[in-house]
Amino acid sequence: MSEPNVRASFADNRRPLSKTKGQLLNMPPVITTALYTAFPVIFLLDKVLAFLTWTNDDPYTNFIAIAIYIMVVKYWTVVACTVLPTIIALGTCASLWFLKTTIDDLRSETAPPTIEEIIDTLINMQARFSYIVEPFSYFGSLSGSDYFNLGFSLIAITPCYIWLMTRIFTVRSFLLVFGVAWLSFHSSWSVATRHLLWRSIVIRKILTFTTGLKFSLVDKNIELTVLNDFQISNVGTGKTVEFHILQNQRRWLGVGWSNTLLPFERGPFTTEDLEKSWDSLESFQFPEITQATCRWRWLDANWKTDDSFAPGEGWIYYNNSWEEPSNTDSLTRFTRTKRWKRRALVIVEDDGTT
């Protein structure tokens, strides 16, 4: 009796059909064609950025890449003669196969990409690219003198670099450390390590000496991050905080100036960045500080008009769109703003104090 046929079933690894109706026909033909044609390139760039930022689905790929890099650099003499040609051949074949299968799958007529997929991929790629260039945004805020100090410091300590590379470190060890640091720069544990090292005053002093840039060398006992909107000064054992609140009014026909504003614009009483609002000055509440136990107390009895904001009664007048500020009122001015100020004392207490 013949044995029955044995069949093995494998999971279907093809990209599933989109359950959402394609919206390519709802777009202009030129934009649709451009997005559909460029989608494979966008998808591949998104995969590369995901690998560099450690935001891919399989983080073990990054560890494998780091392990291969360490092996190649550490055993370069052996690898260059024996394993390197095989690694190059296998890597090239794997890359070409991945590119071909990815492009064929994305351009498949049975499951074409939808506008939602293309836009989501573009948004992910933009976010990951912004995450990569975020460490370099610090250099955009430097002045001309900062760039001069940086260049002068790097040139001045160049002999130290040369001495370290020739006497203590080797080129192989430098490539090993630099390559691993670059490949793991955006990993979560690398970011956490840099944040912990940045808390050290010694590290900041070393960076100040080697780069010529000015870094904050003072560690505060408490981070009053919720008070960034207000002016803070140290007084005794506490901190004096000067709160600045903007009063916004609109002129209505037959009513005059009123705190009643349009629903889509700013509130009647807001912070200077317009992020927080209150109905009146009496409804203002102290910010909550979660970093330590604090006790608030007003230093001023009442709110006062900030004379430095505007002369006269302290109002700055705008047009209907809160633009074109002026110190004088006219028939074309329909909105105005006044700044109030009041000082308070926040005392940082220990956990054991009452």
From Swiss-Prot:
The keyword Endoplasmic reticulum applies. Its main location: membrane. GO terms for cellular component: endoplasmic reticulum membrane; peroxisomal membrane. It is found in: Peroxisome membrane; Endoplasmic reticulum membrane. GO terms for biological process: peroxisome organization. Pfam families: Pex24p. The keyword Mitochondrion does not apply. Glycans are attached at N319. SMART domains: DysFN. It is a multi-pass membrane protein. Disruption phenotype: Results in severe peroxisomal defects, caused by reduced peroxisome-endoplasmic reticulum contact sites. Leads to defects in peroxisomal matrix protein import, membrane growth, as well as organelle proliferation, positioning and segregation. The chain crosses the membrane at residues 24-44, 63-83, 84-104, 151-171, 173-193. Belongs to the PEX28-32 family. PEX30/31 subfamily. With PEX24, contributes to tethering of peroxisomes to the endoplasmic reticulum for organelle biogenesis, positioning and segregation. This is Peroxisomal membrane protein PEX32. It comes from Ogataea parapolymorpha (strain ATCC 26012 / BCRC 20466 / JCM 22074 / NRRL Y-7560 / DL-1) (Yeast).
